[in-house]
Design a protein with these regions (language model features):
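Phosphodiester-processing cores and adjacent nucleic acid-binding clamps
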Residues: 1-273
Length: 273
């Protein structure tokens, strides 16, 4: 409720849920958003295997992040199939999907290139611009020019500053649209300390441990429209594209209807039998 109160106070009309690798919270999020008069956008920040979801070799088979948002019911059905396969077939430290699944189940989805843990930012940080470009073009060709976006973020990290101009260059050279996002893990800047405490609890560390997992800045909160336009004043179209994406995403859950699973009848028999 506090999150939606904050969104309404900032004049926001839509909000997406993109939990890492899971979709457990989607129904509760949808209900709460609807009750608050905010348009809910259902999605997931999936883990994409570096090779295939079946490859599970230590120190070789990691993952890259990718944002997937549901445009419609087809997209939702495809997304839950992939997320489920991530657990039943691709689990290796994280529930991983792969490009084979994306090729099969990409219809009805909008794709964003993700945060610093995405395949494209990783390639850029490694100094491999050509690989980043090839990857971006692969995703654009798969999802379609109107459904794939280069994601721009700026949380004040050194890596953000290194990657951001290269992402803008990549988008302009390929004609792939950009979208500005903020990796919101808490509601206000003041919540950053509480986030650090929760991470300590999660990882079994204390706030004084020098090697504890932490967000290096306090910029991972829900930012206002003005804050985002200030951050990305050099590419205002990236902020405007957030509205375009929100308009494209129109999936809604339907409650109160009995939906039985479909079972194919054995050969020579009808379903009624």
């Amino acid at each position: 409720d506090r999150m939606f109160d904050r969104l309404k106070a900032m004049g926001q009309t839509a909000c997406a849920i993109t939990d890492h690798g899971v979709m457990y919270g989607c129904v509760a999020f949808f209900d709460a958003a609807k009750a608050a008069g905010i348009k809910p956008i259902i999605g997931c920040e999936v883990y994409v295997a570096t090779r295939t979801r079946f490859d599970k070799v230590n120190r070789i088979d990691g993952n890259n992040h990718l944002i997937l948002l549901c445009k419609n019911e087809t997209g939702y059905k495809n997304l839950i199939k992939m997320v489920s396969a991530g657990f039943t077939e691709g689990f290796y430290s994280k529930p991983r999907i792969d490009k084979q699944l994306l090729e099969k189940y990409h219809d009805g989805l909008i794709c964003l290139s993700a945060c610093l843990a995405g395949e494209i930012p990783k390639a850029l940080l490694a100094g491999d611009y050509d690989r980043a470009r090839q990857t971006a073009l692969w995703y654009r060709d798969l999802f379609g020019a109107e459904n794939y976006y280069i994601e721009l973020q700026d949380h004040g990290l050194e890596e953000d500053q290194a990657v951001l101009p290269q992402l803008i260059r990549l988008a302009r050279e390929t004609g792939i649209p950009m979208v500005a996002t903020n990796d919101a893990h808490y509601i206000t800047k003041e919540d950053a300390k509480m986030q650090s405490i929760l991470l300590c609890i999660q990882t079994g560390k204390t706030i004084n441990d020098v090697d504890r997992m932490e967000f290096q800045t306090d910029e991972f909160y829900l930012k206002s429209t003005d804050e985002m336009y200030d951050l990305f004043s050099m590419v205002p179209e990236a902020c405007e594209n957030t509205n375009k994406i929100a308009e494209q995403c129109n999936f809604e859950f339907t409650f109160g209807e009995t939906k039985l699973p479909y079972f194919k009848a054995p050969d020579g028999m009808e379903n009624q039998e």
